[in-house]
């Protein structure tokens, strides 16, 4: 059933990409080839688990095709879906090679004797590699990396053909073995071409700290009355894990610095004791990891990975709602860590007692430790945050500009930094200094008055729909043409900038879209306003109309 569903999805995806007005970019021959290497493993709890034979295929699917697959999949399944791609080197893809690749892409199985022959790059699908003309440079930025929370491993450079001819084939890591088999003679102990080999389970290192962002430290965190309690608690936890507050539960509106504090805990704790095993994950990453472990029958490895830790930090714990299996596993993980006197740090956009969609036994455990809330910073703190931002980005700005922005944008740090970035982008596009004149021009009619202005998602959608001469239902729908998709992405961006709504809440306002769709739109438009004058002007004009609108 899964294979049939996946075939329908890929066929629809390719068909949509050929339509002139489609939002989905043209899918190249190379990308079609990678699509045919994909094998569906499971569709569970709103996540499609896909298997590919090597890391280059994983990178292509996630980076260039992920959002398009998510869109088609969600529409077909009748609920929001995300995609989790995993590398499975044991996949037998030889018998299922794509048939729509030009004949000149076929590569012989033997190594030619010509000394200057260069074998196919091991990053490409077996037996063929695209010519330069196959790259879709027109849409190279359409689906930027990072649209979802997956970690993509960059493929290692391939060995030269000369080395391949001079040295016998040796055992390689799983992600490279298949490609190497196409380029060099096989030793007698290696499996025959196309034969399924026994799965070699990759080792997982629970000590790995690659999930921690080194930029998020206590040194770069601006402390004020609005965040002093969670900051003090976080510092104490980092200095003495499991001896101060366990669990530590940090909550507050989106964009106030919860994630920064969690990374700071991990970075400082490992600075004090490099032997500590620290892991930071979002609730979505935890869910994906759990689903993959069930699929691969590797639950014991999963348990070791999350229970053999000194500090476990899970961000946005509220997103475990509706995932009963994941909640069950997290409950047991929580108990195991707490009984072993290991530190647990959680974050959410609301206090534990308001997490009514989670099981009672989880909420009561969250309430057993210290609950620390963060609220919007005061004026002096907002100015300090902007000074730090300007210094970190190497941007020179007059202090009165920072005071102007800080005095008018007080809902969240994200909104504050967004206004600063907008001024910086305007100055960059116009090659102007960042002074009061530039700031006032960039933010003309956009800054709220001293009195609070209530801006809602409905107001933003109404103004955007009118601006682009479409109705609100069309804007909220699933239309893929640029005339509809672009306004929708602009509206999602403005909802993120001008309201305190979380990503899932914004998605609900747009017809139940998944939060990853909102995240993709926010990043895409945020990138475009620094590169495309048309997009920048649209955001300016829409914001002006929204803030001067009397709509309810």
Swiss-Prot record:
Residue numbers spanned by region Domain IV, binds dsDNA: 428-552
Which keywords fit this entry according to its UniProt record? Answer: ATP-binding, Cytoplasm, DNA replication, DNA-binding, Lipid-binding, Nucleotide-binding
Q: Where is this region: Domain II?
A: 90-210
Residues annotated as binding ATP are: 255, 257-259
Q: Do you know which SMART domains this protein is assigned to? A: AAA, Bac_DnaA_C
Principal localization reads: cytoplasm
Picking any one GO biological process from the record gives:
regulation of DNA replication
Q: Which GO terms describe its molecular function?
A: ATP binding; ATP hydrolysis activity; DNA replication origin binding; lipid binding
Question: Region annotation Domain I, interacts with DnaA modulators: residue ranges?
Answer: 1-90
Cellular component, GO annotation: cytoplasm; plasma membrane
Name the segments for region: Disordered: 113-213
One Pfam family named in its UniProt record: Bac_DnaA_C
The UniProt entry, under HAMAP family, shows: DnaA_bact (MF_00377)
Note what the entry says on domains.
Domain I is involved in oligomerization and binding regulators, domain II is flexibile and of varying length in different bacteria, domain III forms the AAA+ region, while domain IV binds dsDNA.
* PANTHER family, A to Z: CHROMOSOMAL REPLICATION INITIATOR PROTEIN DNAA (PTHR30050:SF2)
What assembly does the database describe for this protein?
Oligomerizes as a right-handed, spiral filament on DNA at oriC.
Q: Any idea what this protein is called?
A: Chromosomal replication initiator protein DnaA
Species per Swiss-Prot/TrEMBL record: Corynebacterium diphtheriae (strain ATCC 700971 / NCTC 13129 / Biotype gravis)
């Amino acid at each position: 059933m899964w294979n049939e569903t996946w075939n329908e999805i890929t066929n629809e995806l390719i068909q949509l990409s050929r339509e002139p007005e489609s939002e989905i970019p043209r899918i190249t021959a190379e990308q079609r080839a990678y699509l045919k290497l994909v094998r569906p493993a499971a569709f569970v709890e709103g996540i499609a688990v896909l298997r590919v034979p090597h890391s280059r295929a994983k990178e292509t699917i996630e980076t260039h095709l992920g959002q398009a697959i998510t869109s088609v999949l969600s529409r077909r399944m009748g609920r929001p879906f995300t995609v989790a791609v995993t590398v499975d080197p044991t996949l037998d893809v030889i018998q299922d090679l794509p048939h729509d690749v030009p004949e000149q892409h076929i590569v012989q199985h033997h190594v030619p004797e010509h000394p200057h022959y260069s074998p196919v790059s091991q990053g490409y699908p077996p037996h063929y590699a695209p010519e330069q003309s196959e790259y879709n440079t027109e849409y190279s930025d359409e689906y930027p990396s990072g649209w979802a929370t997956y970690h993509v491993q960059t493929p290692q450079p391939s060995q030269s053909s000369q080395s391949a001819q001079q040295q016998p084939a040796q055992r390689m890591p799983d992600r490279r073995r298949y490609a190497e088999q196409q380029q060099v003679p096989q030793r007698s102990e290696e499996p025959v071409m196309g034969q399924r080999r026994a799965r070699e389970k990759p080792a997982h290192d629970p000590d790995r700290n690659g999930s921690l962002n080194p930029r998020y430290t206590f040194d770069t965190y601006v402390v004020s009355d609005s965040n002093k309690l969670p900051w003090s608690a976080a510092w104490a936890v980092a200095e003495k894990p499991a001896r101060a507050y366990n669990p530590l539960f940090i909550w507050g509106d989106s964009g106030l610095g919860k994630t920064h504090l969690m990374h700071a805990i991990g970075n400082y704790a490992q600075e004090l004791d490099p032997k500590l095993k620290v892991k930071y994950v979002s609730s979505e990453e935890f869910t994906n990891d759990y689903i993959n472990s069930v699929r691969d029958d590797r639950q014991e490895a999963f348990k070791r990975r999350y229970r053999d830790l000194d500090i476990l930090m899970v961000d946005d714990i509220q997103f475990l709602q509706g995932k009963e299996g994941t909640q069950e596993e997290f409950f047991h993980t929580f108990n195991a860590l707490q009984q072993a006197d290991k530190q647990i740090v959680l974050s959410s956009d609301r206090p534990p007692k308001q997490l009514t969609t989670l099981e009672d036994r989880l909420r009561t455990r969250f309430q057993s430790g210290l609950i620390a809330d963060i609220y919007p910073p005061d004026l002096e703190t907002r100015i300090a945050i902007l000074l730090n931002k300007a210094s970190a980005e190497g941007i020179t700005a007059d202090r009165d500009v920072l005071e102007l922005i800080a005095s008018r944008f007080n809902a969240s740090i994200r909104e504050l930094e967004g206004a600063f970035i907008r001024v910086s982008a305007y100055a960059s596009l116009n090659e102007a200094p960042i002074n009061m004149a530039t700031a006032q021009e960039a933010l003309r009619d956009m800054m709220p008055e001293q009195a609070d202005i209530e801006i809602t998602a409905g107001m933003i959608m109404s103004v955007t729909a009118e601006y682009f001469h479409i109705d609100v239902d069309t804007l909220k729908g699933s239309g893929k043409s640029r005339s509809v998709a672009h306004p929708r992405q602009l509206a999602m961006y403005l909802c993120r900038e001008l309201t305190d709504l979380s990503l899932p809440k914004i998605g609900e306002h747009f017809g139940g879209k998944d939060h990853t769709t909102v995240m993709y739109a926010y990043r895409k438009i945020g990138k475009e306003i620094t590169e495309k004058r048309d997009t920048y002007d649209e955001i300016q004009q829409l914001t002006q109309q929204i803030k001067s609108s009397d709509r309810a």
